[in-house]
Amino acid sequence: MKYDFKKIEPKWQKKWEDERLFEAKDFSDKPKFYGLVEFPYPSGAGMHVGHIKAYSSMEVLSRKRRMQGYNVLFPIGYDAFGLPTENYAIKTNTHPRVITDANIAKFSNQLKSVGFSFDWSRTVDTSKDDYYKWTQWIFLKLFDHGLVFRDKTLVNYCPHCKVVLSNEDSQGGKCDICHTDVIQLPKDVWYLKITDYADKLLTGLDDVDYPEAIKQQEVNWIGKSTGAFVNFTIDGIDEKLEIYTTRPDTLFGVTFMVMAPEHPLIDKYQDRISNMDAINAYRDECAKKTEFERTQLVKDKTGLKIEGLEAVNPVNGKKIPIFIADYVMMGYGTGAIMAVPAHDQRDWDFAHAFGIDIIEVIQGGDISKEAYTGDGMMVNSEYLNGFDNKKDSIAKMTEILEEKGIGHAGIQFKMKDWAFNRQRYWGEPIPLVHCPKCGVVGVPYEELPLRLPEVKDFEPGEDGKSPLARIESFVNCTCPKCGGPAQRETDTMPQWAGSSWYFLRYCDPHNDKAFADMDKLKYWMPVDWYNGGMEHVTRHLIYSRFWHHFLYDIGEVNTPEPYMKRSAQGMILGSDGEKMSKSRGNVVDPLDIVNQYGADTLRVYVLFMGDYGSAAPWNDSSVKGCRRFLDRVAGLTDIISDDKKAVSYETLLHKTIKKVTDDIEAQKFNTAIAALMTLLNEIYKENRISKENLTIFLKLLSPFAPHITEEIYEMIGGEGFLTVSAWPEYDEAKTIDATVEVGVQVNGKVRAAVSIPAGCDKDTAMAAAKANDRVASFLEGKKIVKEIFVPGKIINIVVK
């Protein structure tokens, strides 16, 4: 058969679409499989090869599961709100809706050209009001349950995008969108109380099948620690200064305290502080730094002593100096820390820089050279002296703190509450109203969606306010509670809002009465397998798990965890081994590969290029190799034979069925394809194949290369569509070779290899070994004293 992919691929894509082969059926009697991929952000650049690899895993699994008789839900949609579109809209003076619609159309055509078996009837667009109505609905539920609050705080702010960023969106001190350095600014921020769900997010990991690396990233990000809250006081003032520590056993070693420069007690008692000018100057310098810069361990130690305030250590009554330093943040813990320089390296460095006392309370190191952070016997600690077990000394100190009313056991999380508002246009309007009489009031549910108003100017104000704040007809409204004059919230939600529940909407995408029907949720949820990028583990994955746990708690979904299994693909690097980027000139456009070699070649290559979970460089010669493989597959039509004589590759055929079946489930796609290549070579050695065996081969290859396999299947008279035909089964007995080759040793040295019947007894094996001419030459004139046979592995004859 001539492999004309430019005719074959559009032909079968149209046939599949016309027959609606990939549309999932609600409430089918078949077992269900819900396979999910991270829906794309529809950028103007269109699809890249990373999308192809990311979607190919679940694509192959979904096609295989359909052939195994499952009712498969494999949906797609678009995460369409976001800053890049809005920035482009500002640059080109084009409405974001127009840009988004064009980009989605482009993306959809590209995805279809690769032949992905998505259920297009369930496509969602997070920027459409019939979708974000329910995003707003979930937000209001969070608000009604006390999980939304507003606070004025230092925030991560991108001066280029003019937007507040969450910690997750500003990792490394850079804006996740434009990579500009983030600065700290005081702003009113809407937060979601994700920290209320920290424990559930941690314990929920015990109930899901995620790779250990993903679980550990989430555990580290949540950062749960156990310790104690301790009440220091300020000398001469009836003022409690609470700190949190994981090491209350070291309280006798505290020699100074450090506050965040923004700590409110500084302003409260500024009249007692003699160096406020210096403190304010230091604060100004801190404001120019990102949170990332402030908290780096490897940097010069900066700080300033507060002249006029001293803290009192509650366990020994000693007065200690109070400093401000940039590395202490108001958003972590209580905004103040106790410092034990003998046993914490950062405190030790700070103490040396500022000439502060260092008191040893744990024996074991030389604190004149560095902090000792190991275990040892407690000293200089009164009632803890002699303790040599950290757990016991912590427990004893915590007990005493509670007895004296100067502290208590506690838990802290590194994860912060989720900064949820953005001062931009292209996002979901936050459905809240500010009333001077009633305070903050939610928009009535029956008035949802609160639609984005039409605007001509999308640029955020120089005051950092949203473009919506300039639209009086949107801002001015009536309070839903008292009927008096009020003003709408003008910030919008972050891009992560719509993606926090999209997997639920796929279950019932056209429902206008609820975000999804509960019976459909019970049928489809949880997601059986979710594949996505490692870069989303501490953002989207945590956010969506949080929303889902909340919806479960209020009875709106049927499972606490949304995803039963999660996997991640490795990155496709440029041919130079570097990350693909336009500046390096190493970007590969997947449609160039489709146009030059065909979609099936691209599909096979991205899964054959290496371990699925690892990064791998693009290799043009390997792409050509995959095309040659498919050319040889097409050539099988030329050696179809009616000869009923057994073929030499029958055992290999059954082995291949088993291997491909198992390897797909294990995401070992490269070895599955390699097994098909090996089988193909053996078929060509025999130079004949029956229609029955060819059909088996085509079925195994179909999830990887569905177009060419459908074409050949039709050509040989196959009934219906190969893509929904039954997956082949192997005969376990036929996966065992009739003969095996084993090495023959004489006195422990390998002298030959012989072929023996698989599963034969010792006598048969020994007879075959002794009949070998080379072995016989080493036995001649010798006395056999021992014969050893390890079935299927080795024969050893001991002589003297």
Name every feature range the model reports, one short phrase each.
Residues M1-L36, R66-P75, I99-K106, Y282-F323, ...:
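Conserved oxyanion/phosphate-binding beta-strand-loop segments in alpha/beta enzyme cores
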Residues K2, K11, K15-E19, K91-L241, ...:
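Residue patterns forming the tRNA-binding/recognition surfaces of aminoacyl-tRNA synthetases
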Residues Y3, I8-Q13, V49, T135-Q363, ...:
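NTP-handling and nucleic-acid-processing catalytic cores
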Residues K25-P96, T123-I138, T245-T246, N313-F350, ...:
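N-terminal catalytic cores of NTP/NDP-binding nucleotidyl/phosphoryl-transfer enzymes
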Residues E38-M47, D119-V124, M329-I337, V379-Y383, ...:
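Glycine- and acidic
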Residues R63-N71, K91-R97, N109, S113-S117, ...:
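Secondary-structure transition/capping motifs at alpha-helix termini
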Residues D79, D144-H160, T250, A409-C438, ...:
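Helix-rich, typically C-terminal accessory recognition domains appended to large enzymatic cores
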Residues L309-V315, K319-Y332, V361, V475-S614:
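Alpha-helical recognition segments enriched in aromatics with Gly/Pro capping
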